[in-house]
Swiss-Prot record:
The species this protein was found in: Cereibacter sphaeroides (strain ATCC 17023 / DSM 158 / JCM 6121 / CCUG 31486 / LMG 2827 / NBRC 12203 / NCIMB 8253 / ATH 2.4.1.) (Rhodobacter sphaeroides)
Entries under Gene3D superfamilies matching the protein: 2,3-Dihydroxybiphenyl 1,2-Dioxygenase, domain 1 (3.10.180.10)
Keyword terms, alphabetized: Cobalt, Isomerase, Manganese, Metal-binding
Protein encoded by which gene: epi
Name the record gives this protein: Ethylmalonyl-CoA/methylmalonyl-CoA epimerase
Entry EC no(s): 5.1.99.-, 5.1.99.1
Annotated residues for binding of Co(2+): H7, H79, E130
Cofactor: Co(2+); Mn(2+)
Domain (VOC) ranges: 4-134
Highest taxon, organism lineage: Bacteria
Alphabetized PROSITE patterns for the sequence: VOC
Catalytic residues, chain numbering: E130 (proton donor/acceptor)
């Protein structure tokens, strides 16, 4: 069911500074900022040879990233994202196995324009997991 690692998401207090660090210090290919109002974030994707890094910064009132940064002012790893071929089948199988899907349980369109779901971190060793349909 689980596919390749799509990205590791890192919440950052200063999006421009974080992007510059990846671009200038590490020599990475850094994309342009994208506002994702449905998710309350602005994101920048960093392309690596084998996966991506997603930099997350709060967007708007009630952003879940704002709460994360309040607890972790320097930022930190927010979630990991795995690819799945059929997000509804994956959701149903995970729920049957006892995993909790966050929100309404229905996929939303993510930053790549594909359906995504999030799984409760308490069900995955403290790690928030995102599933993205490929």
């Amino acid at each position: 069911m689980i596919g390749r690692l799509n990205h590791v998401a890192i919440a950052v207090p200063d999006l421009e500074a974080a992007a510059a660090q990846y671009r200038n210090t590490l020599g990475a290919e850094v994309g342009a900022p994208q506002d994702e109002p449905d998710h309350g974030v602005t994101v920048i994707f960093i392309t690596l040879p084998n996966t991506k890094i997603e930099l997350l910064h709060p967007l708007g009132e009630g952003s879940p990233i704002a709460g994360f940064l309040e607890k972790n002012p320097a930022g930190g790893i927010h979630h990991i994202c795995y690819e799945v071929e059929d997000i509804l089948a994956a959701r149903d199988r995970l729920k049957e196995a006892g995993a909790r899907v966050l929100g309404s349980g229905e996929p939303k369109i993510g930053a790549h324009g594909k359906p995504v779901l999030f799984l409760h971190p308490k069900d995955f060793n403290g790690c928030l997991v995102e599933l993205e349909q490929v």
